[in-house]
Amino acid sequence: MFDSSLITYAVSLHFSQKVNDIVISTLQAIADETGNRFMIENKIPPHITIGAFHAAREEAAKLLQLVEDFARDQKAGSVQFSEVGDFNGKVLFLQPEKNLFLSKINNELHTLLLPEFEKAENGYYLPDIWFPHTTLATRLNQSQFSAAEEIAKKISLPLEAPIEELAVYQ
């Protein structure tokens, strides 16, 4: 059972400005066409979440320090977005190839943090079941989905996305 005194922390990868510009212009076009402004209004930056963990408030500094040290030790990497995908016609995303860089960073993060902190998000980011993606639109109805998908298909794929930063969100 979930302990409501715990805080959820998401660890995410961020892209180069060039890739961000492509994704953000797509988010904006989808919002303008469909009226679904969730991604824009919530100021969600383009990212790939590589882990989500619960921590008590008094353990936050420890988690943040572990992630900061982990980020410092990472080698440069990139992902290649190869297709547009969806979750049940409700979420539209860019799907990267699950390459060695992504698999390794996801696995190593969990190896480091799971002994200390509880998994969050029903374990969706655990290495064996993780499905890396960058959300373009979420909470779509059927007509919004069709319009959003047409816009997303205009992104020139494959798209090479250098990773510029590893960040933590609450």
Please state what every model-predicted region is.
Residues 10, 91, 165:
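Short hydrophobic/aromatic beta-strand or adjacent loop that forms the aromatic wall/cage
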Residues 50, 93-94, 136, 168:
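Short hydrophobic/aromatic-rich beta-strand segments that constitute the beta-sheet cores
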Residues 80-82:
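Short, surface-exposed loop motifs enriched in S/T, G, D/E and P with embedded aromatic residues
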